[in-house]
Amino acid sequence: MTASAPAASASARLLDGRRIAEELLDGLKLRVDARLAAGKARPGLAVVLVGGDPASSVYVRNKRRAAEKVGIEAFDYDLPQGTSEAQLASLIDELNADPKIHGILIQLPLPGIPDANRLIQRIDPRKDVDGFHPQNVGHLALREFGLRPCTPRGIVTLLGHTDQPVRGRNATIVGVSNHVGRPMGLELLIAGCTVTSCHKFTPPDVLEASVRNADILVVAVGRPGLIPGEWVKPGAVVIDVGINRLDDGRLVGDVGFDAAAQRAAWITPVPGGVGPMTVATLMQNTIEAADAAESGDSGLGIG
């Protein structure tokens, strides 16, 4: 059963990631149809899943469904628990060399693999549709848009669906993971924000002050209720990346939703906010990787 998103108060408007993602996917399907009509190859996405972790299986299923919806061919590699790093490295080499594959997705975490970064770095950066390869993150740091990390790019798309400006705003990011927090800071810097990043070494009083000052607040830690909604600046845009399952089965974010919704101008629900945008952006990256492969582009300037 699909969890339902909370309803916002009369103060905040919901940034409905499900609806916006569906609109993005509809547009991507048109792009794939146009490619095929022009005699170009169907975009191909290799999806690698190791083990049977229930959460990872759900995420992979959602990605495969999105690929089918837009007309991307998904090549499924469901590998058993205990698959070694050497076996995965060999598979990545095969996928790098396969012209039918335009994007490679390695579902994280990888059970039994202590350092997944070595495998991520083995992926051809031109096929790194998650946007995790150091070369792609480096291009983002240099403001050379190529294959960008999916969640931050999806959040930028969400921000574009509000009536609030982004340029010139104070943005606070809570959480500095390699896949969300750090590249999110780069995205917001490029967009013209003054960015504050908070992390486990940020003193509590500084964290609170930074949140209270934020016109745009992005929280990506994975701790339910970490940010009290009362801290949210009136009129802010709140992007809650966290998704946490409580003992009673409810899914909640990192921000106290009810109180935050009384103060914010816009807020993402959990679930139904950032997650669908991450999946849709993965499809966007895959199509752009296919376009770049057709044109001989090294991967720069495609997004």
Curated annotation (Swiss-Prot):
Q: Please indicate which superkingdom the organism of origin belongs to.
A: Bacteria
Q: How does it assemble?
A: Homodimer.
Q: Name one Pfam family in it.
A: THF_DHG_CYH_C
InterPro entries named among the record's database cross-references: Aminoacid_DH-like_N_sf, NAD(P)-bd_dom_sf, THF_DH/CycHdrlase, THF_DH/CycHdrlase_cat_dom, THF_DH/CycHdrlase_CS, THF_DH/CycHdrlase_NAD-bd_dom
NCBIfam families, alphabetized: PRK10792.1 (NF008058)
Q: What is its EC number?
A: 1.5.1.5, 3.5.4.9
Assigned protein family: Belongs to the tetrahydrofolate dehydrogenase/cyclohydrolase family.
Entry GO CC: cytosol
Single GO term (MF): methenyltetrahydrofolate cyclohydrolase activity
Catalytic activity as recorded in UniProt:
(6R)-5,10-methylene-5,6,7,8-tetrahydrofolate + NADP(+) = (6R)-5,10-methenyltetrahydrofolate + NADPH; (6R)-5,10-methenyltetrahydrofolate + H2O = (6R)-10-formyltetrahydrofolate + H(+)
Protein's name in the database: Bifunctional protein FolD
Under the heading PANTHER family, the entry gives: C-1-TETRAHYDROFOLATE SYNTHASE, CYTOPLASMIC, C-1-TETRAHYDROFOLATE SYNTHASE, CYTOPLASMIC-RELATED
Residues the entry annotates as binding NADP(+): G175, V176, S177, I243
A GO BP term, please? Answer: L-histidine biosynthetic process
Its biological function? Catalyzes the oxidation of 5,10-methylenetetrahydrofolate to 5,10-methenyltetrahydrofolate and then the hydrolysis of 5,10-methenyltetrahydrofolate to 10-formyltetrahydrofolate.
Name the keywords, alphabetized. Amino-acid biosynthesis, Histidine biosynthesis, Hydrolase, Methionine biosynthesis, Multifunctional enzyme, NADP, One-carbon metabolism, Oxidoreductase, Purine biosynthesis
Q: Which Gene3D superfamilies match?
A: Leucine Dehydrogenase, chain A, domain 1 (3.40.50.10860), NAD(P)-binding Rossmann-like Domain (3.40.50.720)
Give the pathway listed in the UniProt entry for this protein: One-carbon metabolism; tetrahydrofolate interconversion
List membrane-spanning regions: none
